[in-house]
Design a protein with these regions (language model features):
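Early extracytoplasmic/lumenal segment of secretory-pathway proteins
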Residues: 30-102
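Short, low-complexity disordered leader/linker segments with a strong preference
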Residues: 1-43
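Extracytoplasmic ligand-binding site segments that recognize negatively charged/polar headgroups
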Residues: 47-48, 52-55, 93-241
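Ligand-binding "clamshell"
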Residues: 102-111, 134-137, 257-269, 333-334
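Paired acidic/hydrophobic, glycine-rich loop segments that form the ligand-binding mouth/hinge
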Residues: 90-94, 229, 246-251, 267
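Conserved C-terminal helix/tail region of periplasmic/extracytoplasmic solute-binding proteins
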Residues: 346-381
Length: 381
């Protein structure tokens, strides 16, 4: 998935210079759990979404730790996985559609969450989520998250929708927009879990062949109704501003940006619930600067940095203590991004995770991510 706030990707140059490992965490290829942090190495090479390494919180980190941050912005989850497997980077801000690929590929190391003091303040749903925690082992620390919401033009879409079914309705042919992402198959599966309960869909990311086929068929029917598959938040904002789209799958950032521009839009979590993304900082099993990587995770988990990033990028912090700081930085932002939402809100969200053959019931007859990628190409053809 492309997780870019603005309309294009900026690539930051990453130097190839590598420092010798310091004591503490070993920097050799290692999949053992990180349980302590030693002397920092003076450098940190990151793969991140654009906006995740902004100077507002990076510069104070460098000053406090001596770890100079060099970041490369990833254009998609697939690109991030590829970059991590080069062994040239220390950590990555992986979304849920990438994290399990890195875990099962042994590309990342487990980390003891006790190393992160603010972990205790995280929302329960993001302490040990299935997209970064396997059999009780934490392969990263959650960072920020956001739901996939149903966005609509209040003047054009009437009555106000309460179901994802509106995205599959011929009534709005040519005015529908959805993300250009294979994980969109999960959104179709979530809709089918309510409209066709006989399919037996319990988890939209664990689909047997018949369930998968039903979701893909629904999306193929939707294809002729779609005005555009959007790649960035800016793409969708433009579609709603110029009237090309009146209803679509979205994120809170788009809604807030459009409402600030006085566009007649609202969003909601439909009755079926919603999918959602959640990012995790994960440390490479080949990290050359692992101690700096741990320090970075500790830093970006603090309430102040979480609040700064949430407002800058347009997302929701994992740390519940960030809410008050968000409102000080931008009045009402805590509620805007659901940082103070009740537990029922989180339960309605099915966070992204990489589809695998494992169906979670001891069987291995689910469709893996490669099948999802191929199907998405077929859907759009």
């Amino acid at each position: 998935m492309r997780r870019i706030r603005r309309g294009h990707v900026l690539l930051a140059a990453v130097a190839a210079a590598l420092c010798l490992p310091a004591s503490g965490v070993s920097s050799s290829s290692d999949n053992s759990t990180i349980t302590k942090v030693g002397k920092t190495e003076g450098q940190l090479n990151l793969i991140a979404w654009e906006g995740y390494t902004y100077k507002q919180w990076v510069n104070p980190f460098v000053k406090a730790t001596g770890c100079k941050v060099r970041s490369k912005f990833g254009g998609s989850s697939d690109e991030m996985v590829t970059l991590m497997r080069t062994g040239q980077y220390d950590a990555v801000s992986a979304s849920g559609d990438a994290s399990l690929r890195l875990i099962f590929g042994k590309d990342v190391r487990p980390i003891d969450p006790k190393l992160v003091p603010d972990f205790k303040n995280f929302i329960p749903a993001l302490k040990s989520p299935s997209h970064n925690t396997v059999k009780g082992v934490h392969y990263g620390i959650s960072l920020q998250w956001g739901p996939n919401t149903l966005l609509y033009n209040t003047k054009k879409v009437k009555p106000a929708p309460n179901s994802w079914s509106v995205l599959y309705s011929s009534k709005y042919k040519g005015k529908i927009t959805v993300p250009d992402n294979p994980i969109q198959i999960a959104d179709a599966a979530l809709s089918l879990s309510r409209s066709k309960p006989n399919l037996g869909i319990k988890d939209p990311y664990e689909l047997t062949e018949p369930q998968f086929k039903a979701a893909v068929d629904l999306l193929k029917k939707q294809h002729s109704l779609v005005r555009k598959y959007w790649a960035t938040a800016g793409d969708e904002i433009d579609l709603f501003k110029n009237g090309s789209a009146t209803v679509g799958a979205s994120w809170p950032y788009q809604t807030n940006t459009l409402q600030a521009a006085k566009a007649p839009v609202k969003d909601l979590i439909p009755k079926e619930g919603a999918t959602g993304w959640a990012d995790t900082w994960m440390i490479s099993s080949k990290a050359k600067h692992p101690n700096c990587a741990v320090k970075w995770i500790q830093w970006v988990s603090t309430p102040k940095v979480q609040a700064q990033q949430a407002i800058y990028f347009g997302e929701t912090p994992a740390n519940t203590k960030a809410c008050a700081i968000m409102d000080k930085l931008s009045k009402g932002s805590c509620a805007q991004y659901h940082a103070n939402a009740p537990s029922a809100y989180f339960r309605s969200i099915k966070f992204w995770k990489t589809p695998t053959k494992d169906c979670g019931n001891g069987k291995s007859n689910c469709m893996d991510y490669a099948k999802w990628q191929q199907a998405w190409t077929d859907i759009k053809s």
